[in-house]
Swiss-Prot record:
Gene name of this polypeptide: ZNF513
Main location: nucleus
Protein name (database record): Zinc finger protein 513
Record flagged with keyword tRNA-binding: no
Tissue: In the retina, expressed in the outer and inner nuclear layers, and the ganglion cell layer.
Organism of this sequence: Homo sapiens (Human)
One protein family per Pfam: zf-C2H2
Gene Ontology terms describing biological process: positive regulation of transcription by RNA polymerase II; retina development in camera-type eye; visual perception
Its biological purpose: Transcriptional regulator that plays a role in retinal development and maintenance.
């Protein structure tokens, strides 16, 4: 029965085969010794099946070799798959039948029975042994290869991904392929359009787990959650900036725990310095409001008295968050509902610590914030600057959000609907105020009497009875009042129809001389009709 061929045959003895010095095959006992046959890496197999078929008793035939009775050379015979001359075969190592083939040298890990580790992607050798990943760092540790960076030629934008750079270049080219189907809004990125559509639907998918706060942007939620993180950090000794809360310490990576892995020094040169450097002397990049810090001359006019603090705070004085229309206030300080509950509970809620903890404060009112862009936006309220104007009417505002809210008056859009009745409106604050009718809640209480109401404007108007302030003064006669509705009714006596001040049209944004004109006019000029007067009354509060 024929034997199965071996996958890795060992050198064997072949009786009856002898190789003489003339490279001819003669029959005779002895060992098989061929200088050109048994080279390292060649597998020789006996074809015993063919021997049985031919009936030869001598094992004279090898795989690829045929016996030549005439004594021809092996290198010139066509039976060889490729010929080897004496010169070519001399480069190999001659083996005898008794010699053993030496195995290639193994690494220290293979000698212990371990598998070799992954090869280095740069040099192909074992990881940690090549010149690219060998000991060359300051501490003798391996050096990590630098990552490929894609940088913008027009600005300092840098990214590790080419797709991010392509998306960023649309910012410079002005291309805005994503357009809103309800308004003229267009954006270069789909994520911005998705965020914008929530302004039409009123959707607020991001909710704070610690309080009822909800918003439509993840960035606003993260900024809000800093108010729950704890006490603020110490102020900067150079510019006085104070962060809202310290960032939590990043846990060290496993590589850092075992030992610091230094990067190449030239890697740090690939990334530009994107940190904000504020020069000494404060926030000089904010709008210059030097003309507002005078002695009341210029815009306010000589002899004008300051407006009572009850009328013009539009932001929470506890956390700096901008208050919506109809949101609560207290005597002498407007505050949001969360800060009011925090003060009622003795400040144990972990909320903001007050205006003293803010890095940027307004010099004209108690407004303070952690962010310089919020202060710059707030200063437009005092300066009277209104860069956002309506294309359908003379309305103008200092804030883009107010303009968007105003445009719903023209379009008739009412995205906010009451779940208990058919009421719908275009302003979220109006929906909240309407919801108090169903709940019967009256969160606005007077600290001097038992008066309470469900709208902040009613509380502000009520507080004028205690203070005796009458900010609305007629320029034609000596009439003064504390209510805008009464003032409009009085203007009909002079034939102005309540649309504006004496001799001024509604588009000029009249403000009573008893108060700084920039404050009352910053929320939009009076408009014709009942809707316009209601909007002015809300803004003046």
């Amino acid at each position: 029965m024929p034997r199965r061929k071996q996958s890795h045959p060992q050198p064997v003895k072949c009786e009856g085969v002898k190789v003489d010095t003339e490279d001819s095959l003669d029959e005779g006992p002895g060992a098989l010794v061929l200088e050109s046959d048994l080279l390292l890496g060649q597998d020789l197999e006996f074809e015993e099946e063919e021997e049985e078929e031919e009936g030869d008793g001598n094992s004279d035939q090898l795989m690829g070799f045929e016996r030549d009775s005439e004594g021809d050379s092996l290198g010139a015979r066509p039976g060889l798959p490729y010929g080897l001359s004496d010169d070519e075969s001399g480069g190999g190592r001659a083996l005898s039948a008794e010699s053993e083939v030496e195995e290639p040298a193994r690494g220290p890990g293979e000698a212990r029975g371990e598998r070799p580790g992954p090869a280095c992607q740069l040099c192909g050798g074992p990881t940690g042994e090549g010149p690219c990943c060998g000991a060359g760092g300051p501490g003798g540790g391996p050096l990590l290869p630098p990552r490929l960076l894609y940088s913008c030629r027009l600005c300092t934008f840098v990214s590790h991904y080419s797709s991010h750079l392509k998306r960023h270049m649309q910012t410079h080219s002005g291309e805005k392929p994503f357009r809103c189907g309800r308004c003229p809004y267009a954006s270069a990125q789909l994520v911005n359009l998705t965020r914008h559509t929530r302004t039409h639907t009123g959707e607020k998918p991001y909710r704070c787990p610690h309080c009822p706060f909800a918003c439509s942007s993840l960035g606003n939620l993260r900024r809000h959650q800093r108010t729950h993180a704890g006490p603020p950090t110490p102020p900067c000794p150079t510019c006085g900036f104070r962060c809202c809360t310290p960032r939590p310490a990043r846990p060290p990576s496993p590589t850092e725990q075992e030992g610091a892995v230094p990067r190449r020094p030239e890697d740090a040169l690939l990334l530009p310095d994107l940190s904000l450097h504020v020069p000494p002397g404060g926030a000089s990049f904010l709008p210059d409001c030097g003309q507002l810090r005078g002695e009341g001359e210029g815009l306010c006019g000589t002899g004008s008295e300051p407006l009572p603090e009850l009328l013009f705070p539009w932001t929470c004085r506890g956390c700096g968050q901008e208050l919506e229309e109809g949101e609560g206030s207290r005597l002498g300080a407007a505050m949001c509902g969360r800060c009011m509950r925090g003060e009622a509970g003795g400040g144990a809620s972990g909320g903001p610590q007050g205006p003293s903890d803010k890095g940027f404060a307004c010099s004209l009112c108690p407004f303070a914030t952690h962010y310089p862009n919020h202060l710059a936006r707030h200063m437009k309220t005092h300066s009277g600057e209104k860069p956002f104007r309506c294309a359908r009417c003379p309305y103008a505002s200092a804030h883009l959000d107010n303009l968007k809210r105003h445009q719903r008056v023209h379009t008739g859009e009412k995205p906010y609907k009451c779940p208990l009745c058919p009421y719908a409106c275009g302003n979220l604050a109006n929906l909240k105020r309407h919801g108090r009718i169903h709940s019967g809640d009256k969160p606005f209480r007077c600290s001097l009497c038992n008066y309470s109401c469900n709208q902040s404007m009613n509380l502000k108007r009520h507080m004028l009875r205690h203070t005796g302030e009458k900010p609305f003064r007629c320029a034609t006669c000596a009439y003064t009042t504390g209510h805008w509705d009464n003032y409009k009714r009085h203007q009909k006596v002079h034939g102005h129809g309540g649309a504006g001040g004496p001799g001024l049209s509604a588009s000029e944004g009249w403000a009573p001389p008893h108060s700084p004109p920039s404050v009352l006019s910053s929320r939009g000029p009076p408009a014709l009709g009942t809707a316009g007067s209601r909007a002015v009354h809300t803004d003046s509060s």
